[in-house]
Amino acid sequence: MSNKKIIFFTGGGTGGHVFPGISIIQKLKEFDNEIEFFWIGKKNSIEEKLIKEQDNIKFISIPCGKLRRYFSFKNFTDFFKVILGIIKSFYVLKKYKPQLIYATGGFVSTPAIIASSLLKIKSITHEMDLDPGLATKINSKFANNIHISFKESEKYFKNYKNIIYTGSPIRREFLNPDPKIIKQLTQNTNKPIISILGGSLGANALNNLALCIKKDAEIYFIHQSGKNLNDLSEKNYLRRQFFNAEEMASIVKFSNLIISRAGAGAIKEFANAGACAILIPFKKGSRGDQIKNAKLLTNQNACIYIDEDEILNINILKIIKKTLKDREKINSLKENIKKFNNKHSSTLIAKLLIKDIKETKSK
């Protein structure tokens, strides 16, 4: 075992599988600046882009194939990509000899977790959503520990002993958002601010919704569209493909109302901010994870839920304006969503990993 302290992270596909890992690394650096960090992911991916924006995290790409629950001819070619990913991960981990590997989700994480098991390197997989995805289900068979973001997720891991409720880490920029930023973005508007957030990859349904309602003169709209639309600034409308972490933190905290998908990472950021949110979970082509996330919050009166198929059949503006006028409802939604926040998540996980490193190096 190397004398160096090394931790590998792996995960990707969306920002929701990357931002929690970045948060953990930020906290680990506060506790121990001697730890070296690596991130295994897919080439030319969202995880490569986000990790290369960070300081002192080395990115290593591997071949990877998507894990599917349904028949597709791509399953045959992707199977071999997974095998190649395991082989490359094996040699990478053997070369650097990390004490730990931490998976934050997504199919790209599975080859590295399997390789770590072959090399007897301690591994941990973190499920961000309420119910585990296929990648986490596979990872959990090889990992030493499982971290979960929702307490309610324990029922999906009844046959596993090493389950730890950690919550989902959020980026440090979200801990103390600056109100001046949203004022600058909205040209110091006095209008209520509605933010339509499509996530790191954008969301066509939310983009179309934004284009339909943005002309309402009584509201200022902030729209994060992803790369499919160009940046645009109008009198009561600001559209960006992406906002940086400081901007997004201010938007989430100080918007009057947020319209968003229901990814676990976004929900945890809304919970931290005590945001009033309308959630429209991704439905078509998904495994239903966002729907379960949104329904969990709805059952505890922590969000307004709208089915994606109903977007064109209902008057969203009417719902928005009715909600804005109902101060009691807004306060209730804000307080209830806070119950899903574990503000010490990054610290808890960082301390667990440091403990694991010490135990590994002492052997």
Curated annotation (Swiss-Prot):
GO terms for cellular component: plasma membrane. Its main location: membrane. The keyword Membrane applies. Pathway: Cell wall biogenesis; peptidoglycan biosynthesis. It is found in: Cell inner membrane. Belongs to the glycosyltransferase 28 family. MurG subfamily. PANTHER family: UDP-N-ACETYLGLUCOSAMINE--N-ACETYLMURAMYL-(PENTAPEPTIDE) PYROPHOSPHORYL-UNDECAPRENOL N-ACETYLGLUCOSAMINE TRANSFERASE, UDP-N-ACETYLGLUCOSAMINE--N-ACETYLMURAMYL-(PENTAPEPTIDE) PYROPHOSPHORYL-UNDECAPRENOL N-ACETYLGLUCOSAMINE TRANSFERASE 1. This is UDP-N-acetylglucosamine--N-acetylmuramyl-(pentapeptide) pyrophosphoryl-undecaprenol N-acetylglucosamine transferase. It comes from Borreliella burgdorferi (strain ATCC 35210 / DSM 4680 / CIP 102532 / B31). The gene is murG.
